[in-house]
């Protein structure tokens, strides 16, 4: 079994790699076992440096590269009649400190009937769906050098 032990910031355009789909729960762990689409078992024993985001690359000591993709999983999808109503739902869910994925037209969170009832009580629609889960990292998340979603941090970031 191949054991992946390194996180890669980037790979060269001509680098060959395999892919694996992992749930959010698994992508939070530094040690796990998984199966590739081909059925081949792999293991990971990675440094504890944060969540593997969809599109992350990991490698073995021998140089084998694997791209990690977010696996579709059962989620609660929140939709609203207005953007303001969706914003209110995001506020209330954020106050409960649950992992929350934001999109322009919907919010996604892991199944929780109590939270679903709360959101429905605000007048929003909650449905179950299968979708890849990439929740927001939050204001207090570990530092990363990926500033794609944060142009302000990128402009003011200083390495000491």
Swiss-Prot record:
Its main location: cytoplasm. One of its GO terms (molecular function) is unfolded protein binding. One of its GO terms (cellular component) is cytoplasm. The keyword ATP-binding does not apply. It comes from the Bacteria. The keyword Chaperone applies. Keywords: Chaperone, Cytoplasm, Nickel. GO terms for biological process: protein folding; protein-containing complex assembly; urea metabolic process. It is found in: Cytoplasm. SMART domains: UreE_N. Pfam families: UreE_C, UreE_N. Involved in urease metallocenter assembly. Binds nickel. Probably functions as a nickel donor during metallocenter assembly. Belongs to the UreE family. This is Urease accessory protein UreE.
